[in-house]
Amino acid sequence: QVTFSRDWSP
């Protein structure tokens, strides 16, 4: 699962 906050984080 990837979430977009500051940058792409797995």
From Swiss-Prot:
<comment type="function">
    <text>The in vivo function of this peptide is unknown. Has no adipokinetic or hypertrehalosaemic activity in locusts. Has hypertrehalosaemic activity in the cockcroach P.americana.</text>
</comment>
<feature type="modified residue" description="Proline amide">
    <location>
        <position position="10"/>
    </location>
</feature>
<keyword id="KW-0964">Secreted</keyword>
<keyword id="KW-0027">Amidation</keyword>
<feature type="modified residue" description="Pyrrolidone carboxylic acid">
    <location>
        <position position="1"/>
    </location>
</feature>
<dbReference type="GO" id="GO:0005179">
    <property type="term" value="F:hormone activity"/>
</dbReference>
<keyword id="KW-0372">Hormone</keyword>
<dbReference type="GO" id="GO:0007218">
    <property type="term" value="P:neuropeptide signaling pathway"/>
</dbReference>
<dbReference type="InterPro" id="IPR002047">
    <property type="entry name" value="Adipokinetic_hormone_CS"/>
</dbReference>
<dbReference type="GO" id="GO:0005576">
    <property type="term" value="C:extracellular region"/>
</dbReference>
<protein>
    <recommendedName>
        <fullName>Hypertrehalosaemic hormone</fullName>
    </recommendedName>
</protein>
<keyword id="KW-0527">Neuropeptide</keyword>
<keyword id="KW-0873">Pyrrolidone carboxylic acid</keyword>
<comment type="similarity">
    <text>Belongs to the AKH/HRTH/RPCH family.</text>
</comment>
